[in-house]
Amino acid sequence: IVSQDSCNDSYFSDTVRTILLSGLVRANFTNELSWNPFEIGQGTVTQYELFKDIGGTFTSVATYLPGDSLFYIDDVAGQDGNNGSFCYRVEATYNLNIPSIGVNETLVSQSNILCLEQRGKIYVPNAIVPNGVNNIFRPVLVFSNDQNYSMKIFNRYGEVIFESADLNTGWDGTVNGRIVQGGVYSY
């Protein structure tokens, strides 16, 4: 940008390259983030800081120095309280020094906010051993909403022998308090 004052003196603005944060969702419960370096003609970046939205507040999760790789892998396994949605932003702290006009300040530039969605997964056991190692049959949901959850267990005659709408309530291999006969049961 060029501006001219009343004396016909021209002033040119500095060029700036903003931070663009991008990312990929990976199947192994990780989010891969990367961003370009912030650039400003008469400024020097002193650090980059990566923030993650945790409970509605952006919290610092990593700090980088200029010259570091601008890349982060966020392991989100076990963080399913937000149904698989994760939001991030990057801040660049820089010193702006323009001696000709007496400017020497430390400033911050923010990237875009990037939100990534992990896909929901369901893990279902393939066997139950009443009074054994795997004594409760119930699926485990990761990054899924259990609002419409329903599970039914059927015997070999197609009769419902267990039913639950509560994800935390699994089948213990009993019907009316008695352990069922070994065999195949469908769900």
Predicted regions mapped to residue ranges:
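Extracellular Ig-like/FN3 beta-sandwich strand-entry sites
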Residues: V45, G81-C87, D146, G182-V184
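Pro/Thr/Ser/Gly-rich low-complexity, intrinsically disordered linker/stalk tracts
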Residues: D5-T44, N97-A127
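Solvent-exposed loop/turn segments flanking beta-strands in beta-repeat/beta-sandwich domains
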Residues: F38-F58, N145-S150
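Recognizes extended acidic, P/S/T-rich segments that occur
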Residues: Q47-N83
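Short loop/turn motifs at secondary-structure boundaries
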Residues: P37, S111-Y187
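Residue-level detector of high-confidence beta-strand sites
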Residues: T15, V61-T63, E163
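Ser/Thr- and Asn-enriched, surface-exposed coil loops between beta-strands
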Residues: A27-E32, P66-F71, A165-L167
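Beta-strand-rich modules
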Residues: I1-D9, Y72-G102
